[in-house]
Amino acid sequence: MGRLSAEEGALLVRLARRAVEEYLENARVIEPPRDTPPSLREKSGVFVTIEKILVDPLARRARRELRGCIGYPEPVLPLAEATIHAAIAAATEDPRFPPMTPRELDTVVFEVSVLTKPEPVDYRSPEELPDKIKVGRDGLIVEYGAARGLLLPQVAVDEGWDPEEFLSYACLKAGLRDDAWRHGGLKVYRFQAQIFVETTPKGDVVERFLEVV
């Protein structure tokens, strides 16, 4: 599928929020609206990230803290439908956090990352891998046997990682040693993401552009 417009991205983010609101308050899984644009009915991978806004009264500024992130790496569902299910799962099923409560809805922002189909990274030796990855452009999936780890493109940017660190943390996410990528036998996939995020809880939605390193 092609790139989404700002309006389509805003629809997805608002759909993610409404899905979580309805699920937490009424235990109901919503359906995509009947007037959902055709572009949002195409199958696509998608991740929904929920971040809690924490205000430091002394510094007089806010920071964001992860509250949940779950999604579909592969295009297995229509985008709008996948966004609904990913949003609910991010709010209630992320094993790193307790399920969200309705009172938290006014203190979190929603981010939707629409993914391209993951493509395998061809390499002959592990030393080639860092040169085949662009921080700010690529997200990573690493696989070794049944182990699998995924990191979105914005994670490497937010953490200030270089390609080697990105690979190492993707391995850790898969439950492997951080240097597993250096020993061969690892399947590595890369993908890109178009990112839309609320600027404030229930506020405007903007597209986030990452700086490619």
Curated annotation (Swiss-Prot):
Residues 7-207 form the AMMECR1 domain. InterPro entries: AMMECR1 (IPR023473), AMMECR1_dom_sf (IPR036071), AMMECR1_domain (IPR002733), AMMECR1_N (IPR027485), AmmeMemoSam_A (IPR027623), Uncharacterised_MJ0810 (IPR023472). HAMAP family: AMMECR1 (MF_00645). Pfam families: AMMECR1 (PF01871). It comes from the Archaea. This is Protein Tpen_0748.
